[in-house]
């Protein structure tokens, strides 16, 4: 029995699926671009998110934790908030009355 046509059809079908659904898969570079410092072993996005949680715990309703977390993801951890530095957390503060 000649299996070459079956193998060729399977290969073509897999290739078509990859082409069709390839855009749905995230690009690897999206997750590795300046997110992780390979020399120091630091994941900047994770540090940023942890600091957002810490600030939310410390400041409660005065701090917009979700907005802080979204900015960590959007900017890939480039602007890490420091709960004791008013300038770094100013965009996430609420003025409650």
Curated annotation (Swiss-Prot):
Compartments it resides in: Secreted
Which superkingdom heads the taxonomic lineage of this protein's source?
Eukaryota
Q: Name one GO molecular function term.
A: neuropeptide hormone activity
Tissue specificity: Expressed in a single pair of brain neurons which extend their processes the entire length of the central nervous system and also to the corpora cardiaca portion of the ring gland. These cells show massive depletion of immunoreactive Eh at ecdysis.
Keyword terms, alphabetized: Disulfide bond, Hormone, Neuropeptide, Secreted, Signal
Fetch the InterPro entries from UniProt: Eclosion
> Where is it chiefly localized?
secreted
Q: Give the UniProt entry's GO cellular component terms.
A: extracellular space
UniProt entry tagged with the keyword rRNA-binding: no
**Signal sequence bounds:** 1-17
Concerning Pfam families, the annotation shows: Eclosion
Between which residues do disulfide bridges form?
48-72, 52-68, 55-83
One of its GO biological process terms is: eclosion
Q: Which family does it belong to?
A: Belongs to the insect eclosion hormone family.
Record's function text = Neuropeptide that triggers the performance of ecdysis behaviors at the end of a molt. It triggers adult behavior patterns: larval, pupal and adult ecdysis, and plasticization during the molt.
| Name of the protein in its database record | Eclosion hormone
Species source reads Drosophila melanogaster (Fruit fly)
């Amino acid at each position: 029995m000649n299996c070459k046509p079956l193998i060729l059809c399977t290969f073509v079908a897999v290739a078509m699926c990859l082409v069709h659904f390839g855009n749905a898969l995230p690009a690897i570079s999206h997750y590795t671009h300046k997110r992780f410092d390979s020399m120091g072993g630091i994941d900047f996005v994770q540090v940023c998110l942890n600091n957002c949680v810490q600030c939310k715990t410390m400041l409660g309703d005065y701090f917009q934790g979700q907005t802080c977390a979204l900015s960590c993801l959007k900017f890939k951890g480039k602007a890490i908030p420091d709960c004791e530095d008013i300038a770094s957390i100013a965009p996430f503060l609420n003025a409650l009355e």
